[in-house]
Amino acid sequence: MHLLYVGLTHRETPLTILEKAHFSDQEGLKALKLLKREKSILENIILSTCNRTELYLVVDQLHTGRYYSKHFLADWFQIPVKELEEYLVFREGDEALRHLLRVSIGLESKIVGESQVLGQLKQAFLTAQDAGTTGIVLNQAFKQALTFAKRMHDTYRINDRPISIGLTAIQELDRMGLDYSTKKIAVIGLGEIGQLVTKYALQRPFESVMLLNRTVSKAQAFLTEDRVSAHGWDELEEVLADADVVFSAVKTEEYIIFPSMLKEGAIVFDLCLPRSCHPSSSLKLYNIENLTNQLEQYKAERQEIAGRIALEIDEELVKFADWRQQLGIIPLIQEIRDKALEAQASAMESLNRKIPDLTEREQKQISKHMKSIINQVLKEPILQLKELSVGEHSDYDIALIAKIFGLHRERGKDEGH
């Protein structure tokens, strides 16, 4: 069995192709089942988001798997194979798994380290399991990837380093340790930055959130809580006078915010260029230059963390390789267990003949304890077998164990390779 990745991503593929090559939620289940019917494809999981459409496959032959998966995508999306081939990326074996691990932690995302893709990957895995298109290999690969990604997020906290001016400003405010329950904030301007600030502000327990925009209806769209209010441009002075914290996300040709308009001790974040707030020395003012410097530092930290995570991915590849190698020992372990259970069943039959008056409860208790003895006796040998299966002389060691147990078999039998 071979691990194969077939994908289109934002890195290599133009938006015009990505828009066509996208599985909707409704199509996903049908596509999984149809893909599994294709020649050579034994297992499959489909990940389809706005930035990528990826097939994670287990195939019995790489060449055949590549051919049929490629044609499946071309037929499904009605894109000529020749055109699709310009952008399709194929990865095999370790490189397929490496890509999966990188995707899981966000190293292949537009925003390095973002965690949204982890939820999308988990959902893709669950959908494939429901469709019955996964098996032992993809189950292990995806469980390992999801566990790895969670551990990396917990260890490195890469998402604690924002990549937007809006979130950087909010986190700068967080560091001041203010009692938000007594603070009123104002967001001036509801363009992209202003909306982002509003989103993060509403996640915090501010006493009130005042939204001011030239088009009041845009502010009214955020009136989801009693503490949120919408204001027009003519209310600027009134809003500023009442705010403890001001986020100005509006582009103006001249200053519209002056110290005299603000409450004493007010904090101002001027988030756009040209600046909208007069740079008075009497103000506690954070401007785009201050925050951009902080943002660049965060971006550099994300890249540095990405490099450290990439090194840990190499360790995950070794773990998966060890697991794959141990697959060969599973049939032998099962045969040893089966042989022991056959002996137990034979002993039980003999016991019942010699002591026919045993009650059903007594028979069950004796059988239970006999199986317990078998499990205790086999526990350590099985652990040692798993260790031997990844050793330098694994073929010889396992053949010897099989011979000792009277199981004359060759390694590789029933492995599915």
UniProtKB/Swiss-Prot annotation:
UniProt binding sites for NADP(+): 189-194
The keyword Oxidoreductase is annotated on this UniProt entry: yes
Any GO BP: protoporphyrinogen IX biosynthetic process from glutamate
Site (Important for activity): 99
EC number of the protein: 1.2.1.70
Family annotation (InterPro entries): 4pyrrol_synth_GluRdtase (IPR000343), 4pyrrol_synth_GluRdtase_dimer (IPR015896), 4pyrrol_synth_GluRdtase_N (IPR015895), GluRdtase_dimer_dom_sf (IPR036453), GluRdtase_N_sf (IPR036343), NAD(P)-bd_dom_sf (IPR036291), Shikm_DH/Glu-tRNA_Rdtase (IPR006151)
Entry domain remark: Possesses an unusual extended V-shaped dimeric structure with each monomer consisting of three distinct domains arranged along a curved 'spinal' alpha-helix. The N-terminal catalytic domain specifically recognizes the glutamate moiety of the substrate. The second domain is the NADPH-binding domain, and the third C-terminal domain is responsible for dimerization.
Subunit structure: Homodimer.
Any further remark recorded for this protein: During catalysis, the active site Cys acts as a nucleophile attacking the alpha-carbonyl group of tRNA-bound glutamate with the formation of a thioester intermediate between enzyme and glutamate, and the concomitant release of tRNA(Glu). The thioester intermediate is finally reduced by direct hydride transfer from NADPH, to form the product GSA.
Name of this chain's protein: Glutamyl-tRNA reductase
Protein species of origin: Streptococcus sanguinis (strain SK36)
High-level lineage: Bacteria, Bacillati, Bacillota, Bacilli, Lactobacillales
Gene: hemA
